[in-house]
Design a protein with these regions (language model features):
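Alpha-helical linker/hinge and terminal dimerization helices associated
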Residues: 7, 43-44, 65-87, 98, ...
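Short helix-boundary/capping micro-motifs
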Residues: 11-29
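A short LG(V/I)-centered, amphipathic sequence patch enriched
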Residues: 15, 41-58
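Central regulatory/effector-binding core of bacterial HTH transcription factors
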Residues: 87-150
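Hydrophobic hinge/microswitch elements
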Residues: 125-126, 134-137, 144, 198-257
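Secondary-structure junction motif
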Residues: 144, 178-184, 188-214, 280, ...
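Flexible hinge/capping segments at coil-to-helix
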Residues: 154-193
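A late-sequence structural motif
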Residues: 257-290
């Protein structure tokens, strides 16, 4: 516990680049914080900071320690929360379309086997989500396979594909897109709203497709809600795209019109955990439920 306390002190100094600001944040005196940093330096025989009367600059050893310290502190916080609550917590981050299409049914299946596990699911940009995973503040990320291939820590991830199905276009009844051609260029002349379309996904498309999308400023609207995109498509001239299994029931009920997407894009979802995180039964079973 003492090592965690010292690492917490180091993390604050590194992040704030100020002993005074870190001491204020931690509720310590300047001398007590200085003593903590010296204790690490003497115990490990390293120098963590270059200090003058006005500046604090991390050494190479300090720069190397910081990401590992953040990761360890995040893991310790999760352990403490789990032990204190007496129940297991599963923290997940996904793309918005995945959250709306796959998570509810997965939770319903998962709860049959692990009824006492709490689940927190949120959405955020994929590069931030993977950073949270690396720092062990979450257990699992779920994104389009092409998106995951573009993240900085991809080589640290154990990735498993869990879904692969075609996209369908959705649009209001009587929309002129139904009379448009069947090429990607033909349909890009309309305004589009897409849930969670990100740069990492786009960057993994072929050069000619990227050029075509950029030439049409696709998409015009990016929303963090698939439901909002569907509502826009239902009541305006905006077109959206969602997975086939979500689109077909809406079309069959007459709520909206739709066609297979001519671009050849698939809703290809992958689950990712850290390679060195070990096998957590609840995480593995949640992925099985997707």
């Amino acid at each position: 516990m003492d090592d965690l306390r010292l690492l917490r002190h180091f993390e604050a100094v590194y992040r704030l680049l100020s002993f005074s600001a870190a001491a204020d944040e931690l509720g310590l005196t300047h001398s007590a914080l200085t003593k903590s940093i010296k204790q690490i330096e003497h115990g490990w025989d390293v120098q963590l900071f270059h200090r003058t009367t006005r500046t604090v600059v991390a050494t190479e050893a300090g720069k190397k320690l910081y990401p590992m310290a953040v990761e360890l502190l995040g893991f310790a916080k999760n352990v403490r929360t789990s032990v204190q609550s007496g129940e297991h917590i599963l923290n997940i981050v996904s793309g918005p379309a995945i959250l709306e299409n796959m998570i509810p049914l997965a939770i319903e299946k998962f709860a049959r086997r692990f009824p006492n596990t709490r689940i927190n699911v949120e959405t955020m940009p994929p590069h931030l989500a993977v950073e949270e995973l690396v720092q062990r503040r979450i257990h699992l990320v779920l994104y389009h396979e092409a998106t995951l291939r573009g993240v900085a820590h991809f080589n640290r991830l154990r990735v498993r594909n869990v879904c692969d199905e075609p996209y369908w276009m959705l649009f209001r009844q009587g929309h002129p897109v139904r009379q448009a051609g069947d090429s990607l260029e033909d349909i890009l002349g309309f305004d589009w709203a897409i849930a969670g379309f990100d740069d990492l996904f786009e960057n993994n498309l072929s050069d000619d497709v990227q050029a075509l999308l950029q030439a049409h400023d696709f998409p015009k609207y990016r929303l963090l809600s698939q439901a909002a995109c569907i509502d826009l498509a239902r009541c305006s001239d905006i077109v959206t795209a969602i997975p086939k299994t979500a689109a077909c029931p809406l079309i069959e009920r007459g709520e909206i019109d739709g066609l297979p997407h001519p671009g050849g894009f698939n809703f290809s979802v992958s689950a990712a955990v850290l390679y060195d995180a070990g096998v957590e039964p609840t995480v593995e079973h949640f992925v099985d439920c997707l």
